[in-house]
């Protein structure tokens, strides 16, 4: 079995980020820009513009996500960072109503996206990405990590709808269940002092 490693998404890893995002699902077309822009911007941007936005975000630093490698192949991605730079969180009514954290608190971070290439699914990469995201957030000064995963116990879901992650993955990583956001989605949190 190939070794799995997780690394920050930095400019030298740009091609790997693109490889991880392009292996099935909406990652290639989204470029993981959905969490950081409002609807009006999202609806008026092209794939090339989204790609440029992500590349600029990575170049500016700090890394907005992590890349999972299976051997030497970029196989997965997770977006993790302060909620304050993920504009969609700040303007999603269900999240704003459910969170108990101040929206302007830079120490409250969020996981908002997972992508795993089709050929690497079913190997536990989401769990590995999440564990590394916890470490990365803690090392970067975050005191709390929040997420908005899908509750797969409520029925079947298309794989493209699981980019938020699943409740079971977060619970296995020590997150606590919070309020329901919408049908099939909940808020989960984990303090990072431990």
Predicted region positions:
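Conserved N-terminal entry element of GNAT/NAT acetyltransferase domains
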Residues: 1-39
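Conserved beta-hairpin
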Residues: 17, 63-78
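Short, solvent-exposed beta-strand-terminating loops
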Residues: 20-23, 78-89, 135-137, 144
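Active-site rim helix/loop that mediates acceptor-substrate recognition in acyltransferases
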Residues: 30-64
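Conserved acyl-donor/pantetheine-binding loop and adjacent beta-alpha core of acyl/acetyltransferases
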Residues: 56, 60, 74-117, 121, ...
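Conserved GNAT acetyl-CoA-binding A-motif
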Residues: 108-111, 137-159
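Conserved acetyl-CoA-binding loop-helix of GNAT-fold acetyltransferases
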Residues: 111-116, 122-139
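C-terminal "cap" of GNAT-fold acetyltransferases
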Residues: 160-194
């Amino acid at each position: 079995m190939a070794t799995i490693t997780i690394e920050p998404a930095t400019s030298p890893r740009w091609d790997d980020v693109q490889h991880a995002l392009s292996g099935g699902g909406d990652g290639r077309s989204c470029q993981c820009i959905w969490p950081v822009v409002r609807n009006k911007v999202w609806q008026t941007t092209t794939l090339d513009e989204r790609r440029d936005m992500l590349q600029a975000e990575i170049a500016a630093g700090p890394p907005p996500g992590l890349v999972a490698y299976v051997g030497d192949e970029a196989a997965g991605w997770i977006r993790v960072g302060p909620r304050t730079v993920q504009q969609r969180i700040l303007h999603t009514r269900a999240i704003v109503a459910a969170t108990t954290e101040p929206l302007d608190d830079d120490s409250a971070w969020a996981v908002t996206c997972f992508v795993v290439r089709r050929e690497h699914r079913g190997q536990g990469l989401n769990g590995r990405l999440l564990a590394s995201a916890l470490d990365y957030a803690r090392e970067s000064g975050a005191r709390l990590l929040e997420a908005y995963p899908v509750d797969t116990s409520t029925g079947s879901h298309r794989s493209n709808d699981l980019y938020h992650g699943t409740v079971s993955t977060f619970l296995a990583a020590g997150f606590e269940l919070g309020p329901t956001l919408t049908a099939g989605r909940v808020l989960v949190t984990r303090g990072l002092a431990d």
